[in-house]
Amino acid sequence: MLLLNPNAPRKVTNVKSTNITPTSAEISWNSVTGANSYVIRYGVDGQTNDRLHYSETASFTLDDAVFAGELAGLKVNVYIQAFEKIYTGSDEIAKANAAMVDNANVWSNVCTIDFPSK
């Protein structure tokens, strides 16, 4: 497959969540050949205000601190996008926003996490 933009995202597969508690979940996916960074998009099911996070590994822990609120009892949808480029920024959110400049909208299939109530 020929990519016109060398920073264009690649399709991420096998997104899964493990170790789900009321306050956190570990999310992992298959590494993408040539990918050096990933953007994680997540949001509460049925709401439109998705959030972004950035990782340079094929894993991410979503917890109350990252979410900036309580996850207990929520259903959260997670999507991942892979990039060849390593992005810079003041924090993981700024890096994710920088990656979206190269966005070709190649998100993984959804991984839905049902956080148990406390």
Regions found by a protein language model. Give the residues of each.
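A recurrent domain-boundary module in secreted/ectodomain proteins
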Residues: 1-7
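Short beta-strand segments within Ig-like beta-sandwich modules, predominantly Fibronectin type-III
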Residues: 51-59
